[in-house]
Structure formats: C-alpha cells, structure tokens
C-alpha cells in the first residue's frame, strides 16, 4: 500500500509506473468480467427449447400461392389441424399437418432438429405426395422471432427460401414462407399459416 506522511509531497515521476500498472489491471479485470458475462448469457440460452411453445394440437388456417414467382395472385385457402410432438427432450420435434383444400386433402410433415454446436435448427419438410424430405431451411430464434433460410432450384431458377415464425403467443403463432429470385432483395410470400391452439 502507498503510504504518504501528512504534508509529504508526492514525486509523480517516481510513482507513475505504479499508477499505470493499477490502471492496466483495472481495465483487464473489467474486460474479463464483460467477456465472462457474455459467455454466461450465451450458454444460458442455447435454443434447445425454442419450439416448446408449439407442442400440442392446433387449428390451422393455411393459404398457398398456386404459382410462385410467376406474377400470380391466385391463392387457395385450406383449413386443417397441426399436431406437434416433442422428441429427444426438446432437441427435436415432429410436426404433422392435415388440411382440407378445395382440390382435396393435403398432408405434410416437418422434422425439426437442433444442432447444439451451431445453436441452430434445421427444418426438414415433406408432403405425402413426394414422401421424401426436402432441402432443410436452417436458422434460429431471436427476440421471439424465428428465421430460417436455404438455397434451392425452382422451375430451373436458383432461389432463396425464407421461412419465418412470428407473432408467438401461448395460444397462437404465424408462419410464412417466401421465395426470392434476386438474391434476397425482394421476397414473395407463397405459404402463410395461422395456428390457434385447440383446448384439451
């Protein structure tokens, strides 16, 4: 400890290295505390349970654009039921959709898998007609909104696909798929669904 007698004058050049050393340690301590706090926040929210809100049975109102990226405005509306089941303690879930459309019944399935290394989800969709999983959209939730992207070929064109989950409450949520053929500058929605939880 630095101890100066009353009335004794301080020789600043003599004690300058001491003050510089104290200041340096203070800065390093504050920086390390900030990094540790950021790491703790990141570990606390790893995203594994981001889809827990959706577990259960939902009434689904679905709209599909019949001819995406063709300048069309012809939509078809469907009514159906969505069932979401938790798998692997929340690290995956299985979605089953059955909808009644003007042209007949539509059945879809989505397998969602959580990657603990990247802290991201992959959404893998299939319908009963194709019976194979499509290209997964990959992304994460931030501030209550999920955004997932992938690149695909549609009618011979390279496109970007965006799938958004928003307006999440305990009893409702909104889904929207959109395509872009200009590198993400503009997006055209082609699949919109609103889910309302069905009471037990």
What is each stretch, according to the model?
Residues 1-9:
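Short, Lys/Arg-enriched N-terminal segments with co-localized hydrophobic residues
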Residues 13-17:
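N-terminal Sec-pathway targeting helices
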Residues 18-30:
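Bacterial N-terminal signal peptides
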Residues 7, 32-35:
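Short stretches within intrinsically disordered, low-complexity N-terminal or propeptide regions
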Residues 34-200:
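Hydrophobic small-molecule pocket/channel-lining residues, especially in calycin-type beta-barrels
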